[in-house]
């Protein structure tokens, strides 16, 4: 999604695990920036694959400057310049992170031509330096379409995580984004969807639904250590973590704060200048290291996801944070995201009154049995499992086999749908 909120500082992983894929070179063109955003699916999976493979994570290739009228214009520029300054870094675990320099002028042919060659030259240099030959290329942002075929590559995977042409944060025309998207779909050996709504609406035949997952042990961690910033906040506490931008339903949040002045909101993450909440009930803590989150999360009573309901972009979202919320065991109240409409343990609201009713019910009637039931929903939906799935898909493709065993895959999808309806 858009810029997130939590410093990308993972808890240390326990050694190198065999996920079924080794000795390969992998380049991922990500839709986010490793140094700025909350970890997405690619971050989690590639960090694991880096234990036995050579992995290069390419930070998001800009799709154009935001408008100067954008309230976050200078903030975005400053962050991107800091990322450029790092260019290529190796992080613990062996994964390489690269921020290639490009010009934010994708809206015209000349700009695209310059960027195509500039990006290709940088990537070829890094591939040579790292000894990457015929790498598997994993694309997760449409703007990489212009450069992938300029690399001496092997397999091409295209992951679709969002409704890209509905992103209000992009300065590019919808037409260019759609053209890139269609181009990648035609050339990819496999198109991977991270959201159920995106997958169900797709007409691509070589597609695969890779559900989001959760770093379960991290978010389920119980700790007696409580962060100093939260000790003085009165209860009950409603919690949200993630970047707060135009997708937030500010009107609903303000109205709830007015009607329930005894409720306090703990907001962890960076905040866009577009989000202005005046009530003293809102407590902004800013960005926190990913590894330190348990010290803050244990103090929250109810987790909320107050997103705009009329925003097309967010309606396709698969919000990893909902699974992270469930892993804590705490009650979860969210706007009606298609991805979670049938998920056990999630309370859905559509109006201010329904939001208040859902939170009141959670505060009054929650039990230890409810907590364990919520955790059971995501306990086995871990990034280790997803990494094994991706490794198996790649292995089949490299062996010139269909990526998907159709019969087994259809059975898995059916089981997933039954599970969402509470049947398992």
Predicted regions span which residues?
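A conserved catalytic-core segment of Leloir-type glycosyltransferases
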Residues: 20, 67-130, 283
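Nucleotide-sugar-dependent
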Residues: 36, 40, 248, 291, ...
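Membrane-proximal helix-turn-helix segments that form the acceptor-binding/catalytic region
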Residues: 45, 121-128, 132, 149, ...
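Conserved catalytic-core segment of nucleotide-activated headgroup transferases in glycan assembly
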Residues: 112-114, 215-299, 322, 349-351, ...
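A short, active-site helix/loop in glycosyltransferases that binds the activated sugar's phosphate group
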Residues: 187-209
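Carbohydrate-associated surface elements
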Residues: 194-197, 210-222
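A charged, aromatic-enriched C-terminal amphipathic alpha-helix characteristic of glycosyltransferases
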Residues: 367-403
């Amino acid at each position: 999604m858009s810029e997130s909120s939590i410093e990308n500082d993972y808890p240390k992983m326990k050694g190198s695990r065999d996920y079924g894929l080794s000795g390969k070179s992998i380049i991922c063109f990500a839709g986010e920036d490793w140094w700025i955003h909350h970890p997405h699916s690619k971050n989690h999976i590639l960090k694991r694959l880096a234990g036995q493979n050579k992995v290069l994570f390419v930070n998001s290739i800009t799709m154009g400057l935001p408008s100067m009228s954008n309230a976050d214009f200078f903030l975005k520029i400053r962050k991107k310049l800091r990322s450029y300054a790092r260019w290529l870094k190796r992080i613990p675990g062996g994964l390489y992170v690269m921020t290639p320099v490009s010009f934010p002028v994708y809206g015209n042919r000349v700009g695209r031509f310059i960027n195509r060659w500039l990006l290709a030259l940088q990537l070829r240099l890094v591939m040579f330096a790292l000894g990457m030959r015929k790498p598997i290329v994993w694309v997760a942002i449409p703007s990489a379409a212009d450069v992938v075929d300029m690399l001496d590559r092997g397999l091409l995977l295209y992951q679709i995580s969002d409704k890209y042409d509905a992103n209000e944060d992009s300065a590019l025309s919808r037409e260019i984004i759609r053209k890139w998207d269609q181009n990648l779909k035609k050339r990819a050996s496999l198109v991977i969807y991270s959201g159920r709504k995106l997958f169900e609406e797709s007409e691509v035949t070589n597609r695969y639904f890779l559900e989001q997952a959760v770093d379960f042990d991290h978010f389920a961690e119980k700790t007696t250590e409580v962060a100093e910033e939260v000790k003085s906040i009165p209860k009950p506490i409603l919690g949200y973590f993630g970047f707060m931008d135009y997708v937030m339903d500010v009107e609903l949040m303000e109205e709830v704060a007015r009607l329930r002045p005894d409720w306090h909101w703990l907001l962890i993450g960076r905040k866009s200048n577009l989000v202005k909440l005046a009530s003293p009930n809102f407590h902004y803590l800013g960005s926190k290291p990913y590894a330190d989150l348990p010290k803050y999360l244990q103090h929250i009573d109810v987790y909320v996801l107050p997103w705009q309901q009329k925003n097309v972009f967010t309606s396709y979202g698969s919000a990893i944070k909902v699974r992270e919320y469930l892993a804590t065991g705490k009650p979860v109240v969210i706007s009606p995201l298609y991805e979670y409409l049938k998920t056990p343990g999630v309370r859905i609201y559509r109006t201010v009154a329904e939001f208040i009713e859902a939170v009141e019910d959670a505060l009054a009637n929650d039990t230890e049995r409810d907590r364990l039931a919520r955790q059971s929903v995501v306990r086995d939906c871990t990034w280790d499992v997803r990494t094994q799935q991706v490794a198996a898909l790649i292995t089949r493709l490299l062996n010139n086999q269909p990526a998907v065993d159709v019969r087994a895959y259809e059975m898995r999808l059916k089981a997933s749908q039954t599970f969402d309806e509470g049947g398992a």
